[in-house]
Amino acid sequence: MAESHGGAKGPAAGAHTGAEGGHGGGFPPFESSTYASQLVSLAIFFVVLYVIVSKLALPKVGGAIEARQNKIEGDLAEAQTLRDQSDAALKAYESELASARSRAQAIGNESRDKANAQAETERKALEEQLAAKLAGAEKTIASTRTAAMSNVRGIAADAAGQIVQQLTGVVPDAASVNAAVDASLKG
C-alpha cells in the first residue's frame, strides 16, 4: 500500500506502520542493540539522582527529623521536670498537711487536757466548798436538834408535871418528873 498525501482512502490512511514509516525495526527501548547505552544512561541518571537526593533532600529531611527528635526529647525532659516538680510539690503538700493535722491534734489534746485539769480543779474546789457547807449544816442541825431536844425535854417535863398534878392533885417533885422524862426519851 502506497502512501498518499491527497485524501483519506480508508482507516489506515496516513498511519505509519512498520518499515513504511521510515523507521526500521521495533520499539527502541526493546531493541537489544541499544541495551548497553540504555544501561549507562540509567546508571548515570541514578547516580545524579542519588547525588541530588543525598546532598540536597536528605540533609533537609534529616535535619527536620533531628530537629523533631530534639524537640520531642526536650518536651519529654521538660515534662519529666514538671512531673518531678509536681511530685515534689505534692509530697511537700502532703507533708505540710500531715504536720498541720499533727499540730491540730496536739493543740486539741492540749486544750482537752487543760480543760480537764481546770474542770478537775474546779470540781475539787466545789467539793471542798460543799463539804465545808455540809459540815456547817450538820453542826447547825445537830445544835438545833440538841436545842430542840432540850426544849422538848423541858416542855415534856412541864407537861408531865401538870398532868400528874391534874390527875393526883399533888405537885410532883421536879427531879422525879425529869428522871421519868429522861427515861422515856432514851427509850
From Swiss-Prot:
Residues 110-122 have a biased composition (Basic and acidic residues). CDD domains: ATP-synt_Fo_b (cd06503). GO terms for cellular component: plasma membrane; proton-transporting ATP synthase complex. The chain crosses the membrane at residues 39-59. Keywords: ATP synthesis, Cell inner membrane, Cell membrane, CF(0), Hydrogen ion transport, Ion transport, Membrane, Transmembrane, Transmembrane helix, Transport. Residues 1-25, 103-122 are annotated as: Disordered. GO terms for molecular function: proton-transporting ATP synthase activity, rotational mechanism. Its main location: membrane. It is a single-pass membrane protein. It is found in: Cell inner membrane. InterPro entries: ATP_synth_b/b'su_bac/chlpt, ATP_synthase_B_chain. F(1)F(0) ATP synthase produces ATP from ADP in the presence of a proton or sodium gradient. F-type ATPases consist of two structural domains, F(1) containing the extramembraneous catalytic core and F(0) containing the membrane proton channel, linked together by a central stalk and a peripheral stalk. During catalysis, ATP synthesis in the catalytic domain of F(1) is coupled via a rotary mechanism of the central stalk subunits to proton translocation. Belongs to the ATPase B chain family. F-type ATPases have 2 components, F(1) - the catalytic core - and F(0) - the membrane proton channel. F(1) has five subunits: alpha(3), beta(3), gamma(1), delta(1), epsilon(1). F(0) has three main subunits: a(1), b(2) and c(10-14). The alpha and beta chains form an alternating ring which encloses part of the gamma chain. F(1) is attached to F(0) by a central stalk formed by the gamma and epsilon chains, while a peripheral stalk is formed by the delta and b chains. This is ATP synthase subunit b 2. It comes from Bradyrhizobium diazoefficiens (strain JCM 10833 / BCRC 13528 / IAM 13628 / NBRC 14792 / USDA 110).
